[in-house]
């Protein structure tokens, strides 16, 4: 989509970060609407957009941006065998749209995701999701979500 520089290590500019914030929100929710700043906090962190830069309440995405996001979500769902029979909308509402708490620690951020009964399915996910490391953010994000219980 052209948001990143040629080395894929930084966003091209502030406008690209803002577009990425709204694209991430669309990716999670599957819809475009007006958002409060507080609903975009995690996306702001993931794009390294400084807090002093205001965000619009709404940003219209291009057809290409929406199609890319929809294909990405469908691809993730298709590569998780336990999601067979689950609609894309059901997948989004069950696993992507969650409440969470974000805390800044000395060396990283901690994202604690609200637990749901069906989170046991996370034990079957064929990729890692406990750490988010991006070249443009200084501190990685540690994800605390469905800690497997060992008895």
Where are these regions (language model features)?
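Short, compositionally biased pre-sequence/patch detector
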Residues: 1-151
């Amino acid at each position: 989509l052209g948001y990143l520089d040629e080395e894929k290590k930084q966003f091209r500019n502030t406008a690209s970060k803002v577009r990425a914030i709204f694209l991430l929100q669309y990716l999670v929710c599957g819809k475009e609407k007006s958002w409060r700043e507080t609903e975009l906090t995690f996306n702001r962190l993931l794009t390294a957009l400084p807090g002093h830069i205001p965000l619009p309440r709404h940003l219209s995405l291009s057809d290409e941006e929406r199609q890319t996001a929809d294909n990405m979500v469908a691809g993730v769902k298709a590569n998780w065998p336990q999601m067979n029979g689950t609609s894309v909308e059901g997948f989004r509402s069950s696993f992507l749209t969650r409440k969470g708490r974000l805390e800044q620690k000395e060396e990283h951020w901690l994202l604690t995701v609200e637990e749901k009964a069906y989170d046991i399915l996370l034990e079957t996910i064929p990729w890692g999701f406990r750490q988010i490391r991006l070249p443009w953010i200084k501190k990685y994000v540690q994800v605390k979500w469905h800690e497997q219980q060992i008895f």
